[in-house]
Amino acid sequence: MKPLLHAFAPGVMALMLLLPQAAQAKEVAPQQKLSNVVILATGGTIAGAGASAANSATYTAAKVPVDQLLASVPQLKDIANVRGEQVFQIASESFTNENLLELGKTVAKLADSDDVDGIVITHGTDTLEETAYFLTLVEHTEKPIVVVGSMRPGTAMSADGMLNLYNAVAVAGDKSARGKGVLITMNDEILSGRDASKMVNIKTEAFKSPWGPLGMVVEGKSYWFRAPVKRHTVNSEFDIKQISALAPVEIAYSYGNVSDTAYKALAQAGAKAIIHAGTGNGSVPARVVPTLQELRKQGVQIIRSSHVNAGGFVLRNAEQPDDKNDWIVAHDLNPQKARILAAVAMTKTQDSKELQRIFWEY
């Protein structure tokens, strides 16, 4: 009896000849095209530096330029074609309305470019949530826009900025992130720019949304759990290209034994709207109510919000007769985000009913 191998020799030999060719074909298969991501640097802790590696809370923000920031994460080249632009070099507590407008117009110009697939904005965390929400309202693009920061400077032990930036670029270059509005990536989470806020100033898990994250980033891959339902970006009635200045809107903080001094001073200084950062359900102390009623008669919009830490939820005509007073409620927006929406919305309308509609929809 002939050996079994000998009987099948022609077939075996043919298979052996094909195997190297198949392996070679696999080796020369074209790699997946990398996305083109632009990083706009504005400063903040992510561009900060301390005197030593032990300085995680005492450091100078906005020191490291964008080219050095990108060089600190060489792995970026493996997930995207990245280039950087230095827009500002400031600590974010110093961000102004003019800075928002300039940044917004820069983002819009890039978003219109065919060779840009996604945009990352490095930003200080103090007002990161305000910038993210502003861009959510005014950028007409489905391309991913991701705002990212860090809680520790790059010089600190266990600095979080490198991974945050890596994750931001991964999300910005991911087609699955399109059409989800402006995003925030911090501490491995993908958060909505609309409702995420800085909840603590000394931990790396600083940013949270009362409604939870949209998803997670793990080793450069995005995993999604929910999608935004409020109007944003391409579905927004506001367009950065049509805005030359934001309306003057101020915030007055309420607390036990508060007086009406701040409200009067803000109105006298030219505020067209005052965000009442109230306790609980945006409550207004009895001694302040007459002043707010009078300011509304003078044309100042009064917008009730809540400064509770984990997320307020202000209902109309609860605590105060908003219909009677012709006041507006901020719904679930915290005071600083309510200021952003009012400042944008009042570039189009001064009507309180229209403004209330906008607060419900955005």
Swiss-Prot record:
Gene Ontology annotations for the cellular component aspect, listed alphabetically: periplasmic space
Active site: T45
Reactions mediated catalytically: L-glutamine + H2O = L-glutamate + NH4(+); L-asparagine + H2O = L-aspartate + NH4(+)
GO MF entry, a single one: glutamin-(asparagin-)ase activity
Keyword field: Hydrolase, Periplasm, Signal
Signal peptide: 1-25
Gene Ontology BP, a term: asparagine catabolic process
EC number(s) given by UniProt: 3.5.1.38
InterPro entries assigned: AsnASE_II (IPR004550), Asp/glu_Ase-like_sf (IPR036152), Asparaginase/glutaminase-like (IPR006034), Asparaginase/glutaminase_AS1 (IPR020827), Asparaginase/glutaminase_AS2 (IPR027475), Asparaginase_C (IPR040919), L-asparaginase_C (IPR027473), L-asparaginase_N (IPR027474)
Family matches, as Pfam families: Asparaginase (PF00710), Asparaginase_C (PF17763)
Protein biosynthesis as UniProt keyword: no
Major enzyme class: hydrolase
Localisation: Periplasm
Residues of the Asparaginase/glutaminase domain: 35-362
Record-listed substrate binding positions: S92, T125, D126
Database matches in CDD domains: L-asparaginase_like (cd00411)
Superkingdom: Bacteria
Quaternary structure, from the entry: Homotetramer.
Similarity comment: family membership: Belongs to the asparaginase 1 family.
Name used for this protein in its record: Glutaminase-asparaginase
Species assigned in the record: Pseudomonas aeruginosa (strain ATCC 15692 / DSM 22644 / CIP 104116 / JCM 14847 / LMG 12228 / 1C / PRS 101 / PAO1)
Source taxonomy: Bacteria, Pseudomonadati, Pseudomonadota, Gammaproteobacteria, Pseudomonadales
Gene name linked to the record: ansB
